[in-house]
Protein backbone atom coordinates (compact mmCIF):
# COMPACT_ATOMS: atom_id res chain seq x y z
CA UNK A 1 0.00 0.00 0.00
CA UNK A 2 1.04 3.59 -0.62
CA UNK A 3 -0.41 7.07 -0.04
CA UNK A 4 -2.88 6.60 -2.92
CA UNK A 5 -4.03 3.06 -2.10
CA UNK A 6 -7.63 2.33 -1.12
CA UNK A 7 -10.25 -0.45 -1.39
CA UNK A 8 -7.84 -3.04 0.03
CA UNK A 9 -10.53 -4.50 2.29
CA UNK A 10 -14.07 -3.77 3.48
CA UNK A 11 -14.18 -1.63 6.60
CA UNK A 12 -15.55 -1.50 10.13
CA UNK A 13 -19.32 -1.88 10.65
CA UNK A 14 -21.16 -1.20 13.93
CA UNK A 15 -24.88 -1.99 13.97
CA UNK A 16 -27.42 -1.46 16.72
CA UNK A 17 -31.05 -1.00 17.67
CA UNK A 18 -31.33 2.79 17.91
CA UNK A 19 -34.00 4.48 15.75
CA UNK A 20 -33.63 5.02 12.00
CA UNK A 21 -36.02 6.86 9.68
CA UNK A 22 -35.54 4.87 6.48
CA UNK A 23 -37.11 1.46 7.09
CA UNK A 24 -36.04 0.09 3.72
CA UNK A 25 -36.14 -3.48 5.01
CA UNK A 26 -39.51 -3.57 6.79
CA UNK A 27 -41.22 -0.48 5.25
CA UNK A 28 -42.89 0.19 8.62
CA UNK A 29 -42.21 3.92 8.95
CA UNK A 30 -42.60 6.07 12.04
CA UNK A 31 -44.36 9.42 11.58
CA UNK A 32 -45.21 10.07 15.25
CA UNK A 33 -43.44 12.57 17.49
CA UNK A 34 -41.64 9.85 19.46
CA UNK A 35 -38.50 8.57 17.68
CA UNK A 36 -38.51 5.47 19.92
CA UNK A 37 -42.11 4.56 19.05
CA UNK A 38 -41.41 2.07 16.28
CA UNK A 39 -39.28 -1.00 17.10
CA UNK A 40 -40.26 -2.53 13.74
CA UNK A 41 -38.43 0.08 11.66
CA UNK A 42 -35.35 -1.71 10.33
CA UNK A 43 -32.96 -0.89 7.51
CA UNK A 44 -30.66 -3.06 5.41
CA UNK A 45 -26.88 -2.66 5.62
CA UNK A 46 -25.16 -1.43 2.47
CA UNK A 47 -22.24 -3.33 0.97
CA UNK A 48 -23.49 -6.84 1.72
CA UNK A 49 -25.42 -9.36 -0.37
CA UNK A 50 -27.18 -10.97 2.61
CA UNK A 51 -29.96 -9.56 4.79
CA UNK A 52 -28.27 -7.59 7.57
CA UNK A 53 -30.83 -5.53 9.52
CA UNK A 54 -30.29 -2.69 11.95
CA UNK A 55 -32.43 -0.11 13.74
CA UNK A 56 -35.10 -0.29 16.41
CA UNK A 57 -36.45 1.70 19.35
CA UNK A 58 -33.58 1.98 21.84
CA UNK A 59 -31.80 5.32 21.55
CA UNK A 60 -29.36 4.33 24.31
CA UNK A 61 -28.37 1.05 22.65
CA UNK A 62 -24.76 0.01 23.24
CA UNK A 63 -22.65 -1.48 20.43
CA UNK A 64 -19.45 -1.43 22.49
CA UNK A 65 -16.49 0.92 22.18
CA UNK A 66 -13.74 1.84 19.72
CA UNK A 67 -10.83 3.94 20.91
CA UNK A 68 -7.50 4.78 19.29
CA UNK A 69 -8.14 3.02 15.98
CA UNK A 70 -6.84 3.75 12.47
CA UNK A 71 -8.89 2.38 9.57
CA UNK A 72 -6.65 2.45 6.49
CA UNK A 73 -7.03 1.68 2.76
CA UNK A 74 -10.62 0.47 3.20
CA UNK A 75 -13.83 0.43 1.18
CA UNK A 76 -15.77 -2.15 -0.79
CA UNK A 77 -18.32 -1.74 -3.60
CA UNK A 78 -20.85 -4.54 -3.91
CA UNK A 79 -22.54 -2.62 -6.72
CA UNK A 80 -23.03 1.01 -7.76
CA UNK A 81 -24.33 2.95 -4.75
CA UNK A 82 -23.99 -0.05 -2.43
CA UNK A 83 -20.68 0.27 -0.64
CA UNK A 84 -18.85 -0.04 2.65
CA UNK A 85 -17.06 2.93 4.16
CA UNK A 86 -14.07 3.02 6.50
CA UNK A 87 -16.50 3.21 9.40
CA UNK A 88 -20.19 2.44 8.92
CA UNK A 89 -22.63 2.83 11.80
CA UNK A 90 -26.24 1.71 11.45
CA UNK A 91 -28.76 2.32 14.21
CA UNK A 92 -25.85 2.63 16.62
CA UNK A 93 -26.98 4.01 19.98
CA UNK A 94 -25.67 6.64 22.38
CA UNK A 95 -24.37 3.95 24.73
CA UNK A 96 -21.63 3.25 22.18
CA UNK A 97 -18.27 4.98 22.67
CA UNK A 98 -16.25 6.18 19.64
CA UNK A 99 -13.08 8.14 20.42
CA UNK A 100 -9.80 8.88 18.64
CA UNK A 101 -10.72 7.35 15.27
CA UNK A 102 -8.87 7.89 11.99
CA UNK A 103 -9.99 6.97 8.46
CA UNK A 104 -7.21 7.01 5.86
CA UNK A 105 -7.94 6.63 2.13
CA UNK A 106 -11.38 5.07 2.08
CA UNK A 107 -12.59 4.25 -1.44
CA UNK A 108 -16.03 5.56 -0.42
CA UNK A 109 -16.99 7.70 2.60
CA UNK A 110 -14.73 8.13 5.58
CA UNK A 111 -17.54 7.71 8.10
CA UNK A 112 -21.25 7.22 7.40
CA UNK A 113 -23.93 7.34 10.08
CA UNK A 114 -27.11 5.52 9.03
CA UNK A 115 -29.55 6.67 11.70
CA UNK A 116 -28.79 6.05 15.34
CA UNK A 117 -27.66 8.35 18.13
CA UNK A 118 -23.95 7.56 18.45
CA UNK A 119 -21.48 10.39 19.08
CA UNK A 120 -17.80 10.54 18.16
CA UNK A 121 -14.91 12.45 19.71
CA UNK A 122 -11.56 13.17 18.06
CA UNK A 123 -12.15 12.11 14.45
CA UNK A 124 -9.70 12.39 11.54
CA UNK A 125 -10.73 11.61 7.96
CA UNK A 126 -7.91 11.78 5.43
CA UNK A 127 -8.25 11.13 1.71
CA UNK A 128 -11.80 9.74 1.43
CA UNK A 129 -12.84 9.17 -2.19
CA UNK A 130 -16.47 10.18 -1.62
CA UNK A 131 -17.86 12.16 1.33
CA UNK A 132 -15.66 12.48 4.39
CA UNK A 133 -18.54 12.51 6.89
CA UNK A 134 -21.95 11.33 5.66
CA UNK A 135 -25.06 11.27 7.82
CA UNK A 136 -28.58 10.18 6.87
CA UNK A 137 -31.48 7.86 7.79
CA UNK A 138 -32.40 10.14 10.71
CA UNK A 139 -29.04 10.06 12.48
CA UNK A 140 -28.69 12.21 15.63
CA UNK A 141 -24.95 12.77 16.01
CA UNK A 142 -22.48 14.98 17.86
CA UNK A 143 -18.96 15.15 16.42
CA UNK A 144 -16.55 16.79 18.86
CA UNK A 145 -13.17 17.73 17.38
CA UNK A 146 -12.64 16.72 13.76
CA UNK A 147 -9.91 17.06 11.15
CA UNK A 148 -10.72 16.39 7.49
CA UNK A 149 -8.18 16.61 4.66
CA UNK A 150 -9.05 15.57 1.11
CA UNK A 151 -6.78 14.25 -1.62
CA UNK A 152 -6.50 16.44 -4.72
CA UNK A 153 -7.46 13.62 -7.07
CA UNK A 154 -10.64 12.41 -5.38
CA UNK A 155 -13.32 13.29 -2.84
CA UNK A 156 -16.79 14.84 -2.78
CA UNK A 157 -18.29 16.77 0.15
CA UNK A 158 -16.60 17.03 3.51
CA UNK A 159 -20.05 16.76 5.11
CA UNK A 160 -23.13 15.37 3.38
CA UNK A 161 -26.35 15.47 5.37
CA UNK A 162 -29.63 13.95 4.17
CA UNK A 163 -33.04 13.52 5.81
CA UNK A 164 -34.84 11.37 4.82
CA UNK A 165 -32.73 9.55 2.27
CA UNK A 166 -34.62 6.57 0.83
CA UNK A 167 -36.86 6.90 -2.25
CA UNK A 168 -39.74 5.13 -0.46
CA UNK A 169 -39.40 7.04 2.81
CA UNK A 170 -42.10 9.66 3.56
CA UNK A 171 -40.80 13.20 4.00
CA UNK A 172 -42.23 13.32 7.54
CA UNK A 173 -40.53 10.12 8.70
CA UNK A 174 -39.14 10.32 12.24
CA UNK A 175 -36.41 10.85 13.34
CA UNK A 176 -35.17 13.73 11.20
CA UNK A 177 -31.40 13.89 10.75
CA UNK A 178 -29.59 16.28 13.12
CA UNK A 179 -25.82 16.73 13.20
CA UNK A 180 -23.72 18.89 15.53
CA UNK A 181 -20.03 19.43 14.75
CA UNK A 182 -17.84 21.37 17.19
CA UNK A 183 -14.10 22.17 16.97
CA UNK A 184 -13.13 21.28 13.42
CA UNK A 185 -10.73 21.93 10.55
CA UNK A 186 -11.88 21.08 7.00
CA UNK A 187 -9.36 21.22 4.14
CA UNK A 188 -11.01 20.66 0.77
CA UNK A 189 -8.32 19.87 -1.80
CA UNK A 190 -10.31 17.72 -4.23
CA UNK A 191 -10.72 18.98 -7.79
CA UNK A 192 -13.90 16.87 -8.06
CA UNK A 193 -15.77 18.47 -5.15
CA UNK A 194 -18.15 21.40 -5.63
CA UNK A 195 -18.91 22.21 -1.98
CA UNK A 196 -17.56 21.54 1.49
CA UNK A 197 -20.88 21.08 3.29
CA UNK A 198 -24.04 19.87 1.55
CA UNK A 199 -27.33 19.58 3.43
CA UNK A 200 -30.73 18.58 2.05
CA UNK A 201 -34.02 16.90 2.88
CA UNK A 202 -34.79 19.22 5.84
CA UNK A 203 -31.90 17.81 7.87
CA UNK A 204 -30.69 20.02 10.73
CA UNK A 205 -27.04 21.07 11.00
CA UNK A 206 -24.96 22.91 13.58
CA UNK A 207 -21.33 23.94 12.99
CA UNK A 208 -19.40 25.74 15.73
CA UNK A 209 -15.79 26.78 16.27
CA UNK A 210 -14.14 25.73 13.03
CA UNK A 211 -11.96 26.59 10.05
CA UNK A 212 -12.72 25.77 6.40
CA UNK A 213 -10.13 26.02 3.61
CA UNK A 214 -11.69 25.19 0.25
CA UNK A 215 -11.27 25.38 -3.52
CA UNK A 216 -15.01 25.87 -4.01
CA UNK A 217 -18.08 27.04 -2.08
CA UNK A 218 -18.33 26.40 1.65
CA UNK A 219 -22.04 25.58 1.89
CA UNK A 220 -24.71 24.13 -0.37
CA UNK A 221 -28.11 24.09 1.33
CA UNK A 222 -30.75 22.43 -0.85
CA UNK A 223 -34.44 23.32 -0.46
CA UNK A 224 -36.14 25.89 1.76
CA UNK A 225 -37.04 23.37 4.53
CA UNK A 226 -33.34 22.52 4.93
CA UNK A 227 -32.44 26.19 5.28
CA UNK A 228 -35.23 26.61 7.84
CA UNK A 229 -33.91 23.61 9.79
CA UNK A 230 -30.37 25.03 10.04
CA UNK A 231 -29.49 25.25 13.73
CA UNK A 232 -26.42 27.47 13.65
CA UNK A 233 -23.10 28.28 11.99
CA UNK A 234 -21.15 30.06 14.72
CA UNK A 235 -17.48 31.01 15.08
CA UNK A 236 -16.58 29.42 11.73
CA UNK A 237 -13.93 31.01 9.51
CA UNK A 238 -14.00 30.03 5.84
CA UNK A 239 -11.67 30.69 2.90
CA UNK A 240 -13.90 29.54 0.03
CA UNK A 241 -14.57 30.65 -3.53
Give the ranges of each region predicted by the language model.
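Extracellular beta-rich repeat passengers
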Residues: 1-129, 134-241
Amino acid sequence: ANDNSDAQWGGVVLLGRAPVSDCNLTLVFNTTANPNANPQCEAQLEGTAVTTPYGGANSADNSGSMRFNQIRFSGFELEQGNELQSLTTGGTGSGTSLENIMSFNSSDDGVEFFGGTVNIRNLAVIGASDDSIDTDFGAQNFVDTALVVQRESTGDNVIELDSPDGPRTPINAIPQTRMFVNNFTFIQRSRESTSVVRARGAGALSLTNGVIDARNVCYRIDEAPTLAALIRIDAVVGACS
